[in-house]
Structures are given as structure tokens and as C-alpha cells.
Amino acid sequence: MPSISVHAYAKINLGLFITGKRDDGYHNLETIFAPVSWHDTLCFSPADAISMRCTNADLPTDGSNLCIRAARSLQEYAGVGDGVSIELDKQVPFGAGLGGGSSDAATVLRVLNGFWNINATVEDLHPLAVKLGADVPYFLEMEGLAYAGGIGDELTDLHAGLPWHVVTVFPAEHISTAWAYGNFHRRFGQSRPDIRTIAADLSGIGDTGRLELFENDFQSAVFEQFPKVRRVHTDLLEAGAVFASLSGSGSAVYGLFETAMDARRAIERQRASYPTNLTPPGFSMRQ
């Protein structure tokens, strides 16, 4: 079989409400996932064993890497003896709240499912995805906007995309998920907006009036600890964003812009200092 190259796209979170802590140590949450065009590229080639190379020397390529773990979990699930050589061109920043590692893992599951002629259904692969990470099912199963509950693995496809230009900025701070969950300002039990319904409405009409309802429970703690992240958030609003927010647990921040001109101007203000991405309205991961 010839080599295959595939993009693995990142995501942002439109709102993120942490609703409680579970007995297993995980937290329940509600969020809206939205894809962005920032992506890694994975190349898969036939091989006798599972191996990996990466353009970013800071990322391990041993058994701790999510790509290797995904390949091995699928190999064990299907009982196949085939190997694969994976080359990862890493462009999505890690420790950014953009789900880059989760997207890579989901791409490995999806591609190797066909590469190894396993042909399992998405429902079959879902348990493997959950074990790899709470965000992995989104990248495996969805294309555009999706509501997520549970630990992020209970998904509802909203069959839509964001109607705005999305500027995403990585302020060069790597924030661990463990730190974020240990420091966010808890407000369990408080009333929350129905973000599933609101997001479905917003995607169709581009109404900016209710965007402020999409709060991120990590944001205030991250802004207190990492002033550079707060500064980028302020800069995006000053550049004309109708809404700006932390993505996930950070440190990436995004702004939603109504015009391409405003979005490009915002990008120009940031790209001299930080990695940036511009995603067009209605973007889908399966384009």
C-alpha cells in the first residue's frame, strides 16, 4: 500500500463550564468544540513494526506518544500484526488547549482502520478513543461544531460551522491540564446557559449578542497566572473581535471577527510575536 498523508486539525472551545468532579477523578464539563484550520500533517507508510518520527524534537516518539499509543491500541483491538511508520509534521502548538495531540491520535485511529483493512465502525473505535483522551472522540467522529458533555466524550453533532473568521494565537505559554484543573475557580452548582441550543442558533444567524454567555471556567485563573495570555485576549478585542476567549485550558486565545479585513489586521498585529492561525467561516475538518 502506498504512503498516505493526512491533516489533523485543531479545535477551539466556545465556552467551557466545569460542572463537577467525578469519583474517578475526572471532571464533568460542558463545551462547544469548533474546528480550526491549524493542523499537523501525518504521513503513514507500510512497515514491519510501529515507529514514529516527529519534526519537533521536544515531543517524545516512544510509547508515551499518543500516536504510538493509538496505533498499538488499534493493533491490539483488531489482532493485526502489521506495522506502520508515522511521520508527524508538528505545527499545532502543544500545551495550548487546541487538542493537537488528541487530533493526531484520532487521525491515527481513523487512517490505520483503513490502512490495516480493519474497517471498524466509529462506534467500535469510540472506546479506544476515550481511553486515549477526552478530546479524541470529537476529532474521530465530528466534522464541525459539536456539543460535548461528560468528560468531553459525550457528543452531539450540531451540523454547522462558526459563521465568523477565527483568529487563533498561541502566546508561547505551555499550560498543563493538571495545573488548570488544580487552579480554576470552582462554581459547581451554579446555573449555566443552554450552550447547546445557543450555539446551534448562533451558527445559523451569526448573532453576536449572546456570545458573552460562552464563558470559560479556566480563563480567570489562567489570566491571573499568565499575563501574556491576558494581553493577547485584550489585543484581539481591541483589534475588533466581537468575542475573544481562552481555548480549553490555554494558553491559546482566539477571537471571532465579522470581516476578513479585521481578522487579517489582527493576525498582522500578533504574528510578529506569536504563532497564529486564521480560519475562514464555516470551516469543517473534512473539507
Curated annotation (Swiss-Prot):
GO terms for molecular function: 4-(cytidine 5'-diphospho)-2-C-methyl-D-erythritol kinase activity; ATP binding. Gene3D superfamilies: 3.30.230.10, GHMP kinase, C-terminal domain. It catalyses: 4-CDP-2-C-methyl-D-erythritol + ATP = 4-CDP-2-C-methyl-D-erythritol 2-phosphate + ADP + H(+). It holds the Pfam family GHMP_kinases_C. The keyword ATP-binding applies. InterPro entries: GHMP_kinase_C_dom, GHMP_kinase_C_sf, GHMP_kinase_N_dom, IspE, Ribosomal_Su5_D2-typ_SF, Ribsml_uS5_D2-typ_fold_subgr. Keywords: ATP-binding, Isoprene biosynthesis, Kinase, Nucleotide-binding, Transferase. The active site is at K11, D135. The keyword Kinase applies. ATP binds at P93, F94, G95, A96, G97, L98, G99, G100, G101, S102, S103. One of its GO terms (biological process) is terpenoid biosynthetic process. Pathway: Isoprenoid biosynthesis; isopentenyl diphosphate biosynthesis via DXP pathway; isopentenyl diphosphate from 1-deoxy-D-xylulose 5-phosphate: step 3/6. It is an enzyme of class 2 (transferase). HAMAP family: IspE (MF_00061). Catalyzes the phosphorylation of the position 2 hydroxy group of 4-diphosphocytidyl-2C-methyl-D-erythritol. Belongs to the GHMP kinase family. IspE subfamily. This is 4-diphosphocytidyl-2-C-methyl-D-erythritol kinase. It comes from Chlorobium luteolum (strain DSM 273 / BCRC 81028 / 2530) (Pelodictyon luteolum). The lineage of its organism: Bacteria, Pseudomonadati, Chlorobiota, Chlorobiia, Chlorobiales. The gene is ispE.
